[in-house]
Amino acid sequence: MERLRYYIAQFLSYTLHPGIMPTAGTIFIISTLPEVFTWDFVIRITSVVFLGTYVGPLVGILILRISGVISSVHLIKREERIYPYLIGAASMIATGNHLERAGVPVEITLSVYLSGMVVVLSTILLPFFKSSAHAAGVSAFYALYICLHQRYGGGEIQYLVLGAMVLGGLSWARLELKRHTLNELLSGALLGFVPMFLLLSK
């Protein structure tokens, strides 16, 4: 049973990786907005977000690992998160700038910028404790879902309940793997949810 719990926790951690949340958010935004978009536009914008918010930071982490700056790509040690976080934030902000100049829907641009801002805030807090990036990513997506539901009627109420259950499941997974404390999960959730909700709920 203990081994099964471990595998379930690992599955949830990889499936709900914070790096894929901006891409998932972009797909949800495009599907919710009242405008009609061509498949070419959808693929192009989604690809840009994926490359800038997942592939770019991942390549940075791999380079840091190969060069010996960090000891693991899992960034378990708090002090080893600083450089990867800075690289990730820079990549996300640059992606947001590119999207803004390309004239994509403002919700996509803001969500990518906010992702970068959350990473910056997490970096600032690192000397004190490591906030959960997983909790921040899922909470930011949850806030995005609520805001788009309020603004455009996108999504269903029951999925809000499901989203809360997913966040609870992720929190259990990170605790089960002993990657975070409850306080680190809570701080990550607040870092992800509050900025996204405050900006997009207007």
Segments (PLM) and residue ranges:
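Short, Lys/Arg-rich, polar N-terminal cytosolic tail immediately upstream
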Residues: 1-9
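Juxtamembrane helix-capping/reentrant segments at transmembrane boundaries
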Residues: 12, 72-87
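The first (N-terminal) embedded transmembrane alpha-helix
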Residues: 12-33
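Transmembrane alpha-helical segments of multi-pass membrane transport proteins and ion-pumping complexes
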Residues: 18, 22-23, 53-65, 89-93, ...
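Membrane-interface helix-boundary motifs at transmembrane edges
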Residues: 37-40, 67-79, 101-106, 179-183
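Loop-to-helix transition at the N-terminal end of transmembrane alpha-helices
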Residues: 39-55, 77-79, 186-189
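C-terminal halves and exits of single transmembrane alpha-helices
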Residues: 85-104, 126-131
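Membrane-embedded catalytic cores of phosphoryl/pyrophosphoryl-handling enzymes
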Residues: 108-202
